[in-house]
Each structure stands twice: as structure tokens, then as C-alpha cells.
């Protein structure tokens, strides 16, 4: 049973003892992609890098879909698919195996409509724009935005913490203002 007991060496502390039952391990049996038209499922499987037979780990799955530097969502957002989303659904659980359906919405590619620079009082605007890897008329790219922020920070005129892009998507028009 779980317990909390006073620490024998330091009376201002307590020791917490917990019994944890992790449950059974589950394994990925199959991954089926739904809604993908831009990339073939073989390529998406390589990017996801979770294979049949791997131990199911929800945290790792979410990282591979959305958080890692080479995550699936980055693949799409770097090609203009700002409105992209993917929802992993457990469609079949049998014994210790899980079948997944990756339900994707690719959406249309977003074009940068405008880039507004606000709060700058130190540098001429054309100097700031010269450092940007994103320009109006280009496809949206998350990597290019991050690279632009790094370049602006390296100029030495701005606090990196204050360089925060305000991304305003317009799904109806397929554009984005930054």
C-alpha cells in the first residue's frame, strides 16, 4: 500500500512510498493513413519512424507527430500547409496489439499575405526586412520563420525573448499575416 512516513534523518521531510502497477505493454500492429494526398504513406511511415512491433508509447507518438525537429507536422508546415492536422486514432485493440488510423487534414497551402514589423525603434525597417527569410507571396514555412527570428536575434539589436511572431491565419483566403 502507498504510505507517507517521516524521514528518519530529517524531521522536516517525509518519505513517500508508492506501489505502481504499469499494466501490460501494448505494441503497434498496423498504421493506416487517411486523408493524405501530398505524401505517400510509405514516406509518412519513414517520417513517423514508429514501426510495426514497436512498444506503444503515446508520448513518443505525439513527439513524432508534432514536437520533434523532424516531426510530421513540420514536414507539412514547412511546405505551406499551415492548416494541417493529424489525429491518431486507435481503431482496433486486440490482445497486446493496437491498429492506428492517422486521420489527416492537409488543407490548402497558405501564402504569406503581409509581414508587419511592430515595436522596432532601433533599426530601419528595411534593415530588419533584409534579414527575413519570409516574404509576402511565398508559401508559409515554419522553419523559415524560426530562421528569420534567429537572424534578427544575431543582429544584436533585439532581445530574443521579445521576438515573437504573431501568426494570423486566414483559412478562407488561404493566407497568413505575420
Regions found by a protein language model. Name each.
Residues 1-178:
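Periplasmic polypeptide-binding modules associated with outer-membrane biogenesis and secretion
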Amino acid at each position: 500500500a502507498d504510505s507517507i512516513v517521516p524521514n528518519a534523518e530529517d524531521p522536516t521531510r517525509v518519505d513517500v512510498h508508492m506501489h505502481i502497477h504499469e499494466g501490460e505493454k501494448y505494441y503497434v500492429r498496423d498504421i493506416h493513413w487517411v486523408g493524405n494526398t501530398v505524401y505517400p504513406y510509405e514516406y509518412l511511415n519513414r517520417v513517423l519512424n514508429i514501426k510495426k512491433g514497436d512498444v506503444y508509447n503515446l508520448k513518443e507518438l505525439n513527439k513524432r507527430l508534432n514536437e520533434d525537429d523532424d516531426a510530421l507536422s513540420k514536414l507539412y508546415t514547412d511546405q505551406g500547409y499551415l492548416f494541417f492536422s493529424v489525429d491518431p486514432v486507435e481503431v482496433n485493440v486486440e490482445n497486446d496489439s493496437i491498429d492506428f488510423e492517422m486521420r489527416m487534414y492537409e488543407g490548402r497551402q497558405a501564402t504569406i499575405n503581409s509581414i508587419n514589423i511592430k515595436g522596432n525603434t532601433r533599426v530601419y525597417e528595411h534593415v530588419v526586412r533584409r534579414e527575413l527569410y519570409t516574404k509576402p507571396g511565398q508559401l508559409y514555412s515554419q522553419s523559415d520563420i524560426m530562421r528569420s527570428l534567429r537572424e534578427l536575434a544575431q543582429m544584436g539589436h533585439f532581445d530574443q525573448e521579445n521576438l515573437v511572431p504573431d501568426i494570423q491565419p486566414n483559412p478562407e483566403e488561404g493566407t497568413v499575416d505575420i
